[in-house]
A protein has these predicted regions:
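N-terminal helix-turn-helix DNA-binding core of bacterial DNA-binding proteins
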Residues: 9-52
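C-terminal regulatory/oligomerization modules of transcriptional regulators
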Residues: 1-8, 67, 97-129
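Glycine-centered, phosphate/nucleic-acid-interacting loop/turn motifs that mediate DNA/RNA or nucleotide
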Residues: 64
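Basic, amphipathic "hinge/linker" alpha-helix immediately C-terminal to the N-terminal HTH DNA-binding motif
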Residues: 74-96
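Conserved catalytic-core motifs of GNAT/GCN5-like acyltransferases
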Residues: 68-73
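Basic amphipathic alpha-helical segments that dock to polyanions
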Residues: 53-60
């Protein structure tokens, strides 16, 4: 079971930048807001830990794909809000194209390698009654 979980996390790791940019494409958001929206939109299937999310946001900012701005919240707290840049929109378009190509290729591979029953093997079919 642990091996399956690790594989699932490997797939997710490759989509973190894409998902964060998708969530930021329409408005500024802060880190906790991003993680909550991501979990909610994915029905809890895509959780992003702070230890993964913040370094990714930092890297996207360093690469010019995001801008960050500190805003005061309440008396003593500040939040860092992230906003996608024009370079970020270009990068997002590139990531979406890559994702579409890869998932399309994987779908084709899955279709071609689907298990086909051997002769004499029982295959359940739906009855048309």
């Amino acid at each position: 079971m642990a091996k399956q979980i690790r594989n699932k996390n490997n797939i997710k790791h490759g989509t973190i930048e894409l998902v964060l940019l998708l969530l930021l494409q329409n408005e500024q958001k802060y880190g906790y807001q991003l993680s909550q929206e991501l979990e909610e939109m994915s029905d809890g299937k895509y959780e992003l830990k702070e230890t993964t999310m913040y370094p990714t946001l930092y890297r996207l900012t360093q690469n010019g794909y995001l801008d960050s701005e500190q805003k005061k919240v309440g008396v003593r707290r500040t939040r860092v809000y992230y906003e996608i840049t024009s370079e970020g929109y270009k990068y997002l378009t590139h990531l979406k194209q890559e994702y579409t190509l890869i998932t399309g290729a994987i779908d084709k591979i899955m279709e071609h390698t689907a298990h086909k029953p051997d002769e004499g093997e029982y295959v359940e079919t739906k009855s048309h009654t």
